[in-house]
Structures are given as C-alpha cells and as structure tokens.
C-alpha cells in the first residue's frame, strides 16, 4: 500500500523527515501515557479495595487462547492495513453477580490479556484490562459477555495506519459454549480505537477471533 493513497496521514500524523515526532504527537503521547497509567492504577486500587471484603468471590475462572480469523469492519473506518493478533487471556471473577436457583443469571468478571499484534511487517505487544458483564450459566459453560476497557500498545503506527497512541479503548463482545469437559470454544469481537483523542485521522481496527478456553 502506498503512502500517497493517504496524504492526510502523511501530512499530519507521521513523523517528520528526520524521523522525529512532531510537538503535537509528543504532547499527545505524553498525556495518553499518563492518562492510561492513571486509569489502570485506579482500577487496580478498586479491585484491591473490593478484595478485602469479597476475597471469597474473587478467583481465576478460565484461561483462553485467541487468534484473529476475519478482518470484516463493524465499527468505524476500514483499516488501510491488514492485521493478525494472537493472545492469551485470563478471566477473574468479580463479586457482583446474581444467579437464580436454576443456575442462570448475570455476573461480572475482569479479562486480562497479553498478545502480539502484527501488521505491515511490524509487531507490537498488546496488554489489556477489560471489566465485563456476563449473561449465562453460573458454571461458565454457556456465556455471553460484553465489556469496555483499555489496552496499551508497544507501538501505535503500522505502515500507513496510525492508531493514534499507546493507549486504546477496547470494546469486546464474546460468546462461548462447552466443547469437551472443561474445554470450551467461542467467538470474540474486539474493537480498538483511540476515540479520536489524537485527531480525526487516526484509525482503529476490528478483530473477529476464535477462542479456546479452559474453565477452572
């Protein structure tokens, strides 16, 4: 893909000719790093405070491995670059839940993930924390989940595509069902975006992923 196809990206959001970031980009990255760090620290503090009174409700629910299988755009603009993502995730139960005697209801959990994002010949480490609301069986065999959280990228520019900065908002929707005993199979939709914090020309991406999980 040629840079000339996206002149606005080259003009406003790419480094200068000597490879240095513009003052606007430096300021944005500085602010986003501190904002993302503050958000993560605040969320961790909330979890620690909660665990003191609800420690019996917290625990590892499942581990999963995921890989992107489709690049169909659902939200936002089409990504000019093609991406692959592979990651592992751990789901921790949170104390807020309500299940009926039949074993069906709603719950909450925290999804923590780490993986590799690959595009335009470049690789990036991606870590995320996403609180989720779940609907399904209490044993986790059948689950529908929806979550909004944050992710940190070790790099935010891939070829002509600029995600905007190291911090990205994450929107996720997933569904899983039992495959064999404690093993499960699921589908996950992930959307990364900086919500135009860094300007109107940044572009996020959608990820349709297959997910294998193991329930504890």
Question: How would you label these PLM feature ranges?
Answer:
Residues 1-58:
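Cleavable N-terminal export/targeting peptides
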Residues 90-94, 133-137, 177, 214-216:
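Residue-level signature of outer-membrane beta-barrel architecture
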Residues 80-82, 123-125, 165-168, 202-204:
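Short sequence motifs at beta-strands and strand-loop junctions characteristic
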Residues 86-88, 204-216:
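Outer-membrane beta-barrel "beta-signal"
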Residues 66-72, 111-117, 149-151, 190-192, ...:
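Outer-membrane beta-barrel pore domains and translocons
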Residues 59-67, 104-112, 127, 142-148, ...:
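Transmembrane beta-strands of outer-membrane beta-barrel proteins
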Residues 74-77, 117-119, 157-161, 195-199:
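Extracellular loop and loop/strand-boundary signature of outer-membrane beta-barrel proteins
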Residues 52-61, 94-106, 121, 138-143, ...:
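Short loop/turn motifs that connect adjacent beta-strands in outer-membrane beta-barrel proteins
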């Amino acid at each position: 893909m040629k840079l000339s196809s996206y002149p606005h990206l080259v003009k406003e959001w790419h480094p200068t000719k000597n490879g240095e970031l513009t003052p606007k980009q430096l300021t944005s990255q500085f602010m986003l790093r501190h904002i993302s760090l503050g958000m993560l620290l605040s969320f961790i503090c909330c979890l620690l405070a909660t665990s003191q009174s609800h420690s019996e409700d917290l625990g590892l629910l499942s581990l999963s491995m995921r890989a992107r299988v489709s690049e169909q755009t659902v939200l936002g603009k089409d990504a000019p670059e093609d991406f692959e993502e592979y990651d592992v995730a751990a789901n921790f139960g949170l104390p807020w839940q309500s299940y009926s005697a039949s074993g069906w209801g709603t719950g909450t959990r925290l999804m923590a993930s780490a993986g590799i994002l690959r595009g335009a010949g470049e690789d990036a480490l991606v870590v995320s924390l996403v609180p989720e609301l779940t609907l399904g069986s209490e044993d986790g065999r059948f689950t529908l989940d929806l979550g909004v959280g944050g992710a940190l990228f070790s790099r935010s520019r891939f070829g002509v595509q600029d995600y905007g900065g190291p911090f990205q908002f994450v929107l996720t929707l997933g569904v899983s069902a039992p495959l064999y005993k404690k093993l499960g199979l699921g589908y996950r939709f992930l959307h990364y975006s900086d919500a135009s914090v860094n300007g109107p020309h940044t572009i996020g991406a959608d990820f349709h992923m297959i997910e294998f999980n193991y329930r504890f």
